[in-house]
Amino acid sequence: MKKWIIILTILMLPFTAHCAEPADSVLEVRYIINEATASFWSDAEIQAWLDQGISDITSRALCFQTSDTITLSTSVYEYSTTTGSVSVSAIVKVLGAFYVSPDNEYIGLKRIYANQIADLPYMAAGPPKYYYHYANKIGILPLPTSTESTNLVRIYFARQASGATLALRIADLPTEYKPLLYLFAASMAWKKEHRFAEANATYATYLQQLNALKQELHNVPPEVKTP
């Protein structure tokens, strides 16, 4: 009987309204674990699991996507912050980049990995051709000269939620992922109570739905093949 209650609860989650955070998300989790007010599980515990879930979802699903620029500087090839002051340490994955030339030409950069750098051909300093993401830095090669200095490279990336409070981090999460956030927190709550069957089943459902949503939204093959 309990298993059917869990399944019905999961199916109802996407249709629930959200207003005041993080209180609403705590109530959503309490609805799943069947504890309307704090008794065995405190609100602080549930909020901590929600925060952990946001990090897990944004890292696995690459769902918090945005773009920014890097301002090139003469003879500098690695950058730790963007023009908009985003720390590269908060970036989960760089999805693409292009260089904006002084003539407003847009030149796509090829992604490489750090272990490929030794295989690159000799390159004189000049306009960028390659980029890599390694050790909380974004590298851009070849080295820019004074001609390229202050020009921009625009990068598209998935990052961790950036809000200063839990309410803002929940707001950073795309709406379609929020029901999965409640499943994650509920699985952690049941684990605390040593209800490992419910915890494992809920976490497995969380992972299954997360992977399915990621495939549907972000792993779609491009409609136009690049040359």
Over which residues does each language-model region extend?
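Sec-dependent N-terminal signal peptides
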Residues: 4-13
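Sec/Tat signal peptide C-region and signal peptidase I cleavage site
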Residues: 13-19
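Glycine-enriched, solvent-exposed interface loops adjoining structured elements
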Residues: 19-227
